[in-house]
């Protein structure tokens, strides 16, 4: 089973003290060691770059990006079919945000149902199972 990894995991690991830091680190260590089969998407990588660059941390953006791609080298593209499915999810599940819908669309279009994230918005999306990341 392949698990999709959201941007908040590497960002919690790179950030300061937070209750989610250790569970995120523990999960990514399992990905790195091959205990967990994982993937991410180009949109997740864009989110990492965008957030750190918006805060003025361009060097940190590059470091987190590079480390995350090293840990999770399977990076799915975002296609027209994904944006169309995202649109459909936004209509079907109106309280879910665009980014979450896009991640879900990429996952569903690639036969992936599990996501590692701390974002509870995924709980409302049919066909998506958000993993519990308690250490």
Residue ranges of each PLM-predicted region?
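Structured helix-beta-strand junction loops
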Residues: 33-35, 71, 92
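Histidine- and aromatic-rich ligand-binding microenvironments
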Residues: 6, 40-41, 96-97, 119, ...
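Short, well-structured N-terminal submotif of metal-dependent ribonuclease cores
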Residues: 1-40, 53-62, 135
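Acidic, PIN/NYN-like endoribonuclease modules and their adjacent C-terminal/linker elements
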Residues: 2, 104, 109-135
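Helix-adjacent hinge/juxtasegments
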Residues: 55-72, 76
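A generic structural signal for short hydrophobic patches within well-formed alpha-helices
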Residues: 10, 45, 122-123
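Active-site neighborhoods of divalent-metal-dependent phosphate/nucleic-acid chemistry enzymes
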Residues: 74-116
């Amino acid at each position: 089973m392949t698990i999709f990894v959201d941007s908040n995991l590497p960002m919690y690991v790179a950030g300061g003290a937070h209750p989610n830091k250790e569970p995120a680190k523990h999960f990514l260590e399992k990905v790195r060691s091959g205990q967990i089969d994982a993937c991410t998407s180009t949109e997740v990588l864009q989110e990492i770059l965008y957030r750190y660059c918006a805060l003025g941390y361009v060097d940190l953006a590059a470091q987190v990006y590079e480390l995350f791609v090293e840990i999770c080298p399977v990076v799915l593209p975002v296609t027209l079919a994904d944006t169309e499915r995202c649109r459909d999810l936004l209509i079907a599940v109106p309280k879910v945000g665009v980014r979450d819908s896009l991640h879900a669309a990429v996952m569903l279009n690639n036969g992936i149902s599990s996501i590692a994230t701390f974002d509870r918005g995924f709980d409302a999306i049919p066909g998506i199972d958000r993993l519990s990341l308690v250490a």
